[in-house]
């Protein structure tokens, strides 16, 4: 192997190592910024209060279809057997009693139950939007339709899957010794498969953001692994330490259930943070990084791209924006898009593409400066992509803005106070 090839290989390895280290730092910063443990604690409390209304909706949907009515108990047993610690299994009896007493609920009680469910679903959506750095939530009607669709179709698909599995495993193929072993293996694998599929769907549907499958799959895999570790840890603790029963007595199921829900949310949110980080991370060489304080340069370039797209009658999606402007990070791009949307300078169409909503010839720079609150840098710095048409236009605008500031800011601070009352002549 020639020295040139060896040198090229080492350069590739160093670049990959730098990319890996950069992604690790980026992922850690996202974990800290997302404050996932606090978010999981909040969701755990709201989820506990939403268990009864959620069960009412789920089993109410099944009751509306006689074909699925016989699978209600089987679905409940499957959920509590595979996804709830044994010490909290008594919660199943409480839910069953609540469902039996459903006819005794008053209108006010039903309104309170539905409100608690909607609050929980709204909190979940807000948390996922925060993880994916989405500032604008869905319209209320759209949000309600998505909630209802997920709950109803998800319930029907779960019951249909159990019915189909029961039919398949009843075939003569699974009556043999090998077939019984295969069926038993499939039933053991089913909880993890259900977890994985549900989490992937949550990542794809809940955020007001286009989450690609290649990002959702690793995040869901991490979440499932963490949840299986939590299950194993719970099994070890509950099987060897019974102190919690002596402390809480008959109420021991409640703290166990609350802790279980909290750790489950931690697992799901950590997986979501990984998925969003994989989508947002972009390895930028030093020469392609936007210097701190020069965000206005990126903003002017971005508006130039939208102006050009409008001339051609096109919109820009977020992937296209990042491809055209490699100096923008995903976080900065989301912030700029959110601010421009708030100014009603941009709008989003039904395909998720961003479009100019106003003529830039009628938008003064002062409006951008006041609303976006970006500083005008005084000193000149090497800027990425400065030599193309957009870079030249943005750099020229910055130079015009900074020229009058330089002379004003060059004067000493003490000169501002030369004419105060009481100063010596």
From Swiss-Prot:
It is found in: Cell inner membrane. GO terms for cellular component: plasma membrane. It is a multi-pass membrane protein. It comes from the Bacteria. InterPro entries: UPF0761_bac, Virul_fac_BrkB. It holds the Pfam family Virul_fac_BrkB. Keywords: Cell inner membrane, Cell membrane, Membrane, Transmembrane, Transmembrane helix. The chain crosses the membrane at residues 48-68, 105-125, 154-174, 182-202, 219-239, 250-270. Belongs to the UPF0761 family. This is UPF0761 membrane protein XOO3615.
């Amino acid at each position: 192997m020639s020295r040139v090839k060896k040198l090229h290989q080492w350069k590739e390895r160093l670049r990959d190592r730098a990319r890996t280290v950069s992604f690790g730092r980026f992922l850690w910063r996202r974990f800290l910024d997302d404050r996932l443990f606090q978010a999981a604690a909040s969701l755990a409390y709201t989820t506990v209060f939403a268990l009864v209304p959620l069960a009412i909706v789920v089993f109410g949907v099944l009751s509306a279809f006689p074909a699925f009515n016989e699978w209600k108990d089987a679905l409940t047993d499957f959920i509590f057997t595979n996804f709830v610690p044994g010490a909290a299994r008594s919660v199943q009896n409480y839910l069953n009693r609540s469902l039996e007493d459903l006819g005794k609920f008053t209108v006010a009680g039903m309104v309170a139950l539905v409100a608690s469910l909607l609050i929980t679903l709204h909190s979940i959506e807000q948390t996922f939007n925060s993880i994916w750095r989405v500032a604008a939530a869905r319209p209320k009607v759209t949000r309600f339709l998505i909630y209802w669709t997920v709950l109803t179709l998800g319930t029907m698909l779960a019951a249909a899957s159990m019915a189909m599995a029961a039919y398949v495993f009843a075939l003569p193929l699974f009556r043999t010794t090998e077939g019984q072993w295969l069926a038993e293996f499939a039933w053991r694998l089913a909880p993890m498969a259900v977890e994985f599929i549900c989490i992937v769907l949550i990542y794809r549907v809940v955020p007001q953001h286009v989450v690609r499958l290649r990002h959702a799959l690793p995040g869901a895999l991490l979440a499932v692994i963490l949840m299986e570790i939590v299950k194993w840890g719970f099994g070890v603790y509950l099987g060897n330490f019974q102190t919690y029963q002596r402390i809480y007595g008959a109420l021991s199921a409640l703290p166990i259930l609350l802790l279980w829900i909290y750790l489950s949310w931690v697992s799901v949110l950590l997986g979501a943070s990984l998925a969003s980080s994989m989508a947002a991370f972009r390895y930028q060489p030093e020469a392609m990084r936007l210097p701190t304080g020069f965000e206005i340069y990126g903003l002017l370039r971005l508006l130039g791209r939208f102006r050009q797209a409008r001339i051609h009658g096109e919109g820009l999606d977020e992937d296209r924006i990042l491809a055209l402007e490699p100096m923008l990070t995903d976080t900065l791009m989301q912030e700029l898009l959110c601010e421009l949307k708030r100014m009603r300078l941009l709008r989003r169409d039904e395909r998720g593409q961003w479009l100019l909503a106003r003529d830039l010839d009628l938008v003064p720079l002062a409006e951008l400066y006041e609303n976006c609150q970006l500083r005008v840098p005084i000193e000149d710095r090497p800027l990425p992509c400065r030599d193309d048409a957009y870079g030249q236009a943005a750099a020229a605008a910055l130079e015009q803005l900074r020229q009058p500031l330089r002379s004003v800011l060059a004067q000493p601070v003490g000169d501002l106070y030369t004419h105060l009352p009481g100063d010596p002549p």
